[in-house]
Structure formats: C-alpha cells, structure tokens
C-alpha cells in the first residue's frame, strides 16, 4: 500500500464531554458510567474501514452510537444529548471553546498517536512544525 506509520507517543484514553454533562467534574469515568449516554463518532465516509477509525475502542458495540462528519455537530450533540467521545485528551480550546472537558477513562488501554505518510515522500516544513507541536504533548 506504500504507506508508513510513524508513532509519536502513547497516551491515556479520555472521555470528552460537555461541562454540563452529568459526569463532568469527575476525576475518572468508567465504561459502566457511560452506558446510558450516546457515544459520538466521526463518520469516515462510504469506504470506511475500522483500520482507519480515529476513535479508540471503535470495534466495541455501544448501546447508542451517533456518527457525525463535522466538529460543530459533535459539539452540539455533546451539549444537547449529553453525548461523549473518546479521545487522546489533546484538546484545542481555541477551536472548541471552553465548555468541554477531557476526563480520564478508567482503563489500562493506551492510544497510539502518530501519522501516516506515503513511503518516500518528504514532509513539508509546515508538516514538520505540526509534528513537533504534537510531540510536545507526549
């Protein structure tokens, strides 16, 4: 497939939710506590493969799963339906606002953060800068 993955770091799994969510403010959240709330996932398109899923635990069966293809919809569903998503905990407040929290999920699983590029292709200066910013979260 001529693609290569480069790992940058591993991190804990976080639950990303609205500050008004009933579980907001906790030190940790368990899967059992999340069962009654909709899990939000980014839609990957018609040719989706779970190999390319952005979310950790993407193969689990959730009681409620809502897929969206844009950040604004995801954030509205977090507020309006007490939805959540699982993430790395790396949150850009400038994009999403300050009305959301990332709370550690009680699990031994780790997320692997990295990037995919075509073999033999050089990374641009801007790409290298972005990668260095990501490394800063390790």
What are these regions (language model features)?
Residues 20-29, 107-109, 120-126:
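Short helix-loop capping/hinge motifs at secondary-structure junctions, enriched
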Residues 50, 70-72:
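Conserved glycosyltransferase catalytic-site signature
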Residues 2-39, 43:
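Flexible hinge/capping segments at coil-to-helix
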Residues 2-12, 72-120:
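Beta-alpha-beta core module
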Residues 56-65, 99-100:
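A local structural motif
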Residues 134-138:
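Periplasmic-binding protein-like
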Residues 31, 36-60, 123-131:
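Secondary-structure junction motif
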């Amino acid at each position: 497939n001529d693609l290569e993955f480069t790992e940058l770091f591993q991190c804990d799994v976080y639950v990303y939710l609205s500050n008004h969510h009933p579980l907001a403010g906790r030190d940790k959240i368990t899967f059992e506590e999340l069962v009654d709330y909709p899990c939000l996932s980014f839609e990957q398109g018609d040719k989706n493969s779970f190999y390319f899923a952005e979310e950790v635990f993407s193969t689990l069966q959730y009681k409620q799963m809502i897929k969206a293809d844009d950040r604004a919809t995801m954030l509205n569903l977090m507020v309006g339906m007490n939805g959540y998503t699982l993430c790395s905990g790396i949150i850009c407040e400038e994009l999403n606002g300050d009305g959301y929290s990332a709370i550690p999920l009680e699990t031994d699983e780790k997320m692997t953060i990295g990037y995919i590029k075509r073999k033999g292709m050089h990374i641009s200066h801007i790409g290298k800068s972005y990668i260095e910013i990501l490394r800063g979260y390790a």
